[in-house]
Amino acid sequence: ELLGIGEFTDSAFSKYRNSAFFTVENGKALNGKIENVKRFAKIGVRIMTLTWNEMNEIGSGVLSEDKCGLTDFGKLAVAEMEKYGIVIDISHASDELFYDVVNQTNKPFIATHSDSRTITQNPRNLTDEQIKIIIQRGGLIGLNLHNAFLNNNPDKACMNDVLKHCEYMLSLGCDKRLI
């Protein structure tokens, strides 16, 4: 069953034990055209990652030289995403983009594949404050199993590192927000 726009909620997760969502990873797929948000929503896209590490029309990724946050187009895009029920994914976003999303949006947003920056000091990971904001806004966080995000020495990454990130996020209040 395809969930309708706006049905991305806790009750949807409890009703459907096994779920899949149509997603777009990298808002660059909008091609700088705001009307593409509506088009993606109509074909069933429910989640969109705003950037993929680098700068795009929406804003700055974690590896962008220019850490501008959301662009003017990006501000329009996140408003349209909220309007059409596409959940914003801030994985790959710069810190500036993250906080612009906090200030420009009202609905929960998510980080589908991000770990704790306290455990592994990688700028791609989330700070404690960012984790707490996602929780407070009713969003979700999914762990990332990439070695470089799990351990400061990626060659040594193992399952224990996954557990460390999981336990740490749970200690910050992610008990119902960690996927």
Give short role names for the model-derived ranges.
Residues 1-34, 62-83:
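A metal-dependent hydrolase metal-coordination microenvironment
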Residues 1-3, 8-15, 38-45, 101-105, ...:
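Acidic (Asp/Glu)-rich catalytic clusters
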Residues 30-40, 165:
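Short, acidic/polar
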Residues 39-95:
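Metal-dependent enolase-superfamily TIM-barrel catalytic cores that perform enediolate-based chemistry
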Residues 57, 95-154:
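Catalytic core of soluble alpha/beta enzymes
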Residues 71-73, 123-129, 158-164:
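Charged helix-capping and loop-helix junction motifs
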Residues 144-145, 172-179:
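Short acidic/histidine-rich active-site segments
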Residues 162-172:
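A short, acidic, amphipathic alpha-helical segment used as a generic capping/interface helix at domain edges
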